[in-house]
Amino acid sequence: MPKERRSRRRPQPIIRWVSLTLTLLALCQPIQTWRCSLSLGNQQWMTTYNQEAKFFISIDQILEAHNQSPFCPRSPRYTLDFVNGYPKIYWPPPQGRRRFGARAMVTYDCEPRCPYVGADHFDCPHWDNASQADQGSFYVNHQTLFLHLKQCHGIFTLTWEIWGYDPLITFSLHKIPDPPQPDFPQLNSDWVPSVRSWALLLNQTARAFPDCAICWEPSPPWAPEILVYNKTISSSGPGLALPDAQIFWVNTSLFNTTQGWHHPSQRLLFNVSQGNALLLPPISLVNLSTASSAPPTRVRRSPVAALTLGLALSVGLTGINVAVSALSHQRLTSLIHVLEQDQQRLITAINQTHYNLLNVASVVAQNRRGLDWLYIRLGFQSLCPTINEPCCFLRIQNDSIIRLGDLQPLSQRVSTDWQWPWNWDLGLTAWVRETIHSVLSLFLLALFLLFLAPCLIKCLTSRLLKLLRQAPHFPEISFPPKPDSDYQALLPSAPEIYSHLSPTKPDYINLRPCP
């Protein structure tokens, strides 16, 4: 009797799932990015500008400081080049791409984060437009770029072509310590009326950066200012690019007046004994995703949420598995029943054929006996010697027919129940083995999802949020200030000092540098 065959349905290989999960985790590693930001106000890099429209060595010091900065150790290096006396800053080194124009332009193949006022170039006039004859006044255009750059493999070119009035250019790639506090004389009470620079800058900046935090620090005693001297001096440290025969120097200083700490709430330009002082608000932009420099703290995941998620997914998947198994079991049982019916029909047909064959053999034997008896009555020998041929006899093999009768039903020889991998079934009934199978599958799936599902969800969520934040927003903002226009404060809860900001015409007489 042949050995019975048993069909096995082994459990799903857990190792394959684990390898697939580890592959997904490896692909979902966060991309390492780094950003360097420019800021306005205190703690900023500056460049000096001389009468021949060339930069002093302070810009080289800025580039060298950036190349050696511990804050941006892996960022591309800066190089400096002069074309017809005008500086060109390339990042990384140039590869045949140069831009010219009357304004500062930014050409990039990678994506900038939070560019200043959402455009490639931006002019912010602190005063009304000056005529061609006002070479000695302080009518300058203030142009600043806030660039939060991440890793890229393209060419980033930052080019300035200075025509007419020289723009105020500030560079800052990392924070530097505050310069030593200068010894300022007592301030004069003759204030030069300022215009709407603070409110203008705050309002336009707030509307341009929906995904960036605006850092505003107006609290005393510290206030940044730019001192205007009426003579040209060379500087080995950082400076600013300003018109001919003028050098602006930026410091964070304190003002000790009789009214307490000086707070530039309504005046932008005021007189001191050595010249005029230009006050700038300490505004900087911070990307919300990298606002905190402290290492991120690890927050313990709620065990209730993790267990609930894992068990819910496990129960759902196990229910699907049991349902599929039940359907497969039902289909296999129906197939076995049909095969048993066909088997019985075939066995019946074979037995009937065997019976008919036995009857034919009996008829043949009877005919042989009759012929032999007839030949002997006539005086001859039997049939075979008379015709001189060997005698043939019909022999029927009944072994296969006997085996057909010993066959068991197909349902007893093929098991439709799940078998253990080691070919033993613990001697349990079918429904008990199916229950153990379901419970074991539920436990394995719950354990698997409890450890790996939160990691996958967190990885996919972070990747989705990163893709959503990578879309650059460049809102076009044009704000030619009207003489009689009003400007809103940045926030409704801003200090009371900002509610008095109103546009006023500058006093052209007091705008000239003091001797």
Curated annotation (Swiss-Prot):
Region annotation Fusion peptide: where it falls in the sequence: 304-324
Q: Name one Pfam family in it.
A: TLV_coat
Positions occupied by motif CX6CC? 384-392
Q: Which residues lie on this side of the membrane: Cytoplasmic?
A: 457-515
Q: Name one GO biological process term.
A: fusion of virus membrane with host plasma membrane
Q: How is it modified after translation?
A: Specific enzymatic cleavages in vivo yield mature proteins. Envelope glycoproteins are synthesized as an inactive precursor that is N-glycosylated and processed likely by host cell furin or by a furin-like protease in the Golgi to yield the mature SU and TM proteins. The cleavage site between SU and TM requires the minimal sequence [KR]-X-[KR]-R.
> Residues on the Extracellular side?
34-435
Outline the segment boundaries, as ranges, of region: Immunosuppression.
365-381
Q: Where is the lipid attached (S-palmitoyl cysteine)?
A: C455
Question: In which domain of life is the source organism classified?
Answer: Viruses
Q: List the disulfide bonds.
A: C212-C215, C212-C392, C384-C391
Q: Which residues form a coiled coil?
A: 330-376, 388-420
Keyword set for this entry? Cleavage on pair of basic residues, Coiled coil, Disulfide bond, Fusion of virus membrane with host cell membrane, Fusion of virus membrane with host membrane, Glycoprotein, Host cell membrane, Host membrane, Host-virus interaction, Lipoprotein, Membrane, Palmitate, Signal, Transmembrane, Transmembrane helix, Viral attachment to host cell, Viral envelope protein, Viral penetration into host cytoplasm, Virion, Virus entry into host cell
Q: What does this protein do?
A: The surface protein (SU) attaches the virus to the host cell by binding to its receptor. This interaction triggers the refolding of the transmembrane protein (TM) and is thought to activate its fusogenic potential by unmasking its fusion peptide. Fusion occurs at the host cell plasma membrane.
* Domain remark from Swiss-Prot or TrEMBL: The 17 amino acids long immunosuppressive region is present in many retroviral envelope proteins. Synthetic peptides derived from this relatively conserved sequence inhibit immune function in vitro and in vivo.
Quaternary structure and interacting proteins, as annotated: The mature envelope protein (Env) consists of a trimer of SU-TM heterodimers attached by a labile interchain disulfide bond.
| Name recorded for this polypeptide | Envelope glycoprotein
Q: What is the native source organism of this protein? A: Bovine leukemia virus (isolate Belgium LB59)
